[in-house]
Every structure is written in C-alpha cells, then in structure tokens.
Amino acid sequence: MQRSFRRFTFFCLLTASCFIFNASIQAEKPAKIVFISGKPSHGRMKHEHRAGNMILADALDRSGLDVETVLVPVLGYPEDLSVFENAATVVIFCTGHQGHVLNPHLAEFDALMKSGVGVVMIHWATEAEKGEPGQKFLEWMGGFCDLDWSVN
C-alpha cells in the first residue's frame, strides 16, 4: 500500500512538473497576433482595412506587452499559410457578407479555430452570410452581424 502511494505521489509530482515546465516555456514566447486586411471599400480613404490594422499593430508593438504582430503582406486571405504557425490570435478587418475574406477559406480557418487560435473581427468583418459562414461565425465568436436582422 505504501509503495503504491509513493508511485502515485511520484506520478502526480512528475505530471505537475511537466505542466509547470510547459507553461514556463510557453510564457517565454510572445503572443503572435496575425492581422488580415480586406481590400479597401466604400471609396478612397474610407474603410481602409490595412491602414487600420497597421495602426493597431503599431499600438500593440509600442504597448510593452509581450506580443509579436504580423501583418499579412497581401490584401485578403494569406497566400502563405505558414503565417498562422504559432499564432495566438488572428485579427480580421475587412468587408463582410459576400465580400468577406474568409468565405472561400471557411474549412481552412475552421481548422485553425479548432486548434485553439483566437479570432477578433473588426467592424463589418463581423457580418456573415446566412448558412455555412454564419454557422462558423457562431461557433467561433458566438454571434455575427446578420443583414436585415442585426441593427446598430
């Protein structure tokens, strides 16, 4: 009986040590925040998604927080998906509904969300079409802006 208690205690201490060691390793890495910008909409100097993301990324970089900001170099969904490696969260600032950058990439992005990456959608990026896009937004964020239903 005493021997099994020692084994159990050793196992518990070993398991706890692994969790603590893993947490300390993860804490050393800055939180990677990936910014996706949609194409400009509503005319010149209106809804400048990339400019907005640049301002937010710069503010985070200057904040002193332990973060690494990455602006996707193209407008729209990234061509090089390695940008998502080790991401803590993805910030999306784009036109919504039929013009949403995620519409053609729902399955890819869903896999990213299911891996534990967070998502922040800004302004019209919260607007999804009914059907699969809306369902995914519900899963990822708990809601979405629905045309003819949501009212500001």
Question: Predicted regions span which residues?
Answer:
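Aromatic-Pro/Gly-enriched surface loop or interdomain linker
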Residues: 27-87
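A glycine-rich, often tryptophan-bearing local segment used as a flexible ligand/cofactor-contacting loop or short
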Residues: 99-152
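N-terminal secretory signal peptides that target proteins for export/translocation
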Residues: 1-6
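The substrate-binding groove and active-site-proximal loops of carbohydrate-active enzymes
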Residues: 42-43, 89-100
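Structural recognition of the beta-strand scaffold that forms the well-ordered cores
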Residues: 32-37, 68-71, 89-94, 113, ...
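Alpha-helical structural motif
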Residues: 12-13, 52, 133
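Bacterial N-terminal signal peptides
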Residues: 9-22
